[in-house]
């Protein structure tokens, strides 16, 4: 699963159900006949934690990682990220007063403006 081209793309990147969906999973599972459902769940949790940890490490690491979304509610994903990122405090955004459920609305404008240099406004043409 980790050989999917998405994981080789450079940051910043984002994705969701438009790419990682039942069709994607079916293609992956066809390569591994007879896999048990609990092994699928464990593999997806590990894939999530590993891909996040790798990107954090490629960016130079961090002292604290704030997690939101479905992964923040998954104890296995949170535990694995903590293990894969020694020295990094892995927390949920809710612990800092920002509801993980509201993050998508807050994230989208930030994603649009992230590439803008400080003190420089870029106007659409």
Curated annotation (Swiss-Prot):
Pfam families noted in UniProt: AnmK (PF03702)
UniProt-recorded Gene Ontology molecular function terms: ATP binding; phosphotransferase activity, alcohol group as acceptor
GO biological process: amino sugar metabolic process; peptidoglycan turnover
Cited InterPro entries: Anhydro_N_Ac-Mur_kinase (IPR005338), ATPase_NBD (IPR043129)
Family membership noted in the UniProt record: Belongs to the anhydro-N-acetylmuramic acid kinase family.
Protein name: Uncharacterized anhydro-N-acetylmuramic acid kinase-like protein
Native organism: Yersinia enterocolitica
